[in-house]
Amino acid sequence: MEAVLVAMSVPATTEDDGFSLITDKLSYNLTPTSDVEIVTSDNRRIPAHSGVLASASPVLMNIMKKPMRRYRGCGSKRVIKILGVPCDAVSVFIKFLYSSSLTEDEMERYGIHLLALSHVYMVTQLKQRCSKGVVQRLTTENVVDVLQLARLCDAPDVCLRSMRLIHSQFKTVEQTEGWKFIQEHDPFLELDILQFIDDAESRKKRRRRHRKEQDLYMQLSEAMECIEHICTQGCTLVGPSNVVDNNKKSMTAEKSEPCKAFSTCYGLQLLIRHFAVCKRRNNDKGCLRCKRMLQLFRLHSLICDQPDSCRVPLCRQFRKRGEQDKKMGEDTKWKLLVTRVVSAKAMTSLCQSKKNKCEQAQGV
């Protein structure tokens, strides 16, 4: 059966090994001009031109440079055997070498075979297209087979996407024949897959833990702003302790307006009021709520950049204590906490600034 190729023109060049690219329009219908025959698994013979094959594939070029073997019935034509794949896949492969065209139907039918051929014969353009096409057609049924081929064909993108699909649908993939096959015949691949899944789960846990930590630092950053806001301006329940306002009505009106972070601010107000009247604060056993408030006061003192004029209670006292701890080398954990809280505050400010700009742009 004679395959049909799209006609194309090829620029003429001269090679040291004795063969040159053909400058006429090429097609399989012009069998007298062909000087190569591609033999497939079922002995189908596909006529081709050495110049075109050599220009499209460095592997085929090396084959052309070797001394030609004589085969009965082939005359003076060079014979190249491409075995191990369907004959139609070979026809599509040769057609691509001529025309660089590949239909979706051909990709659907022979994508895996074309990926193997493009790797063996080093046809980069075809390999890239096949990699994308094979990835788009991955299913739980074929993913293990595709992964095995991708490893052999040095297709890292296909390997990665296959691994991710196996990870996300592992329970389904476990029931497939492909998985059962590698369990019996390729334990190293099975181990690699399980290792990939384990690493992916570990990364997911680390990301989840990191998000929780970032949320905590964001909350602490918000708490620091609320403490300063409460002790400087006052809020619904608590006002500044060292500011006397003769206009009580205006003071009440100012306090009655809740701040933006009301839930955090309200909780801190309750803590501050408890801290002010708690009798167990100085006991040996102590008070858990008071200890928490003291820790927040200490964190504020380490972040505060205006300790002399700060109205937050115990700010200057903790500042002096922090300097003593620094000399003794006992502030490492607090220093790390301050760094992360300050970073979280900077990120929050940046996000808020971008949000405000977007809102202004939309308003305009």
From Swiss-Prot:
Gene name on record?
BT2
Q: Which GO terms describe its biological process?
A: abscisic acid-activated signaling pathway; auxin-activated signaling pathway; circadian rhythm; embryo sac development; pollen development; protein ubiquitination; regulation of DNA-templated transcription; response to abscisic acid
| Record note on quaternary structure | Interacts with CUL3A. Interacts with GTE11/BET10 through the BTB domain.
Report the Pfam families cross-referenced here: BTB, zf-TAZ
| Protein name (record) | BTB/POZ and TAZ domain-containing protein 2
Keyword Mitochondrion part of the UniProt annotation: no
Which pathway, metabolic or otherwise, does it act in? Protein modification; protein ubiquitination
Source taxon at top rank: Eukaryota
Record's comment describing the protein's domains: The BTB/POZ domain mediates the interaction with some component of ubiquitin ligase complexes.
Major site of localization recorded for this protein: nucleus
Chain ranges for the short sequence motif Nuclear localization signal as given in the UniProt record: 203-212
Quick one: where's region CaM-binding? Answer: 327-350
* Native source species: Arabidopsis thaliana
Say what the protein does.
May act as a substrate-specific adapter of an E3 ubiquitin-protein ligase complex (CUL3-RBX1-BTB) which mediates the ubiquitination and subsequent proteasomal degradation of target proteins. Plays a key role as a component of the TAC1-mediated telomerase activation pathway certainly by targeting a telomerase repressor to degradation. Seems to occupy an integral position in a complex signaling network that perceives, integrates, and responds to multiple, and sometimes competing, signals. Enhances responses to auxin in postgermination and vegetative development.
Keywords, in A-Z order:
Cytoplasm, Metal-binding, Nucleus, Ubl conjugation pathway, Zinc, Zinc-finger
Query: Membrane-spanning residues where?
Result: none
Question: What does the tissue specificity note say?
Answer: Preferentially expressed in young leaves and roots.
Q: What induces it?
A: Up-regulated by auxin (IAA), methyl jasmonate (MeJA), hydrogen peroxide and nitrates. Down-regulated by salicylic acid (SA), abscisic acid (ABA), hydrogen peroxide, sugars, cold and NaCl. Positively regulated by the transcriptional factor TAC1. Circadian-regulation; expression increase during the dark phase and decrease during the light phase.
| Knockout mutant characteristics | Altered response to auxin. Blocked ability of TAC1 to induce telomerase. Hypersensitive response to both sugar and abscisic acid (ABA)-mediated inhibition of germination.
Zn finger region (TAZ-type): 215-316
Where would you find this protein in the cell?
Answer: Nucleus; Cytoplasm
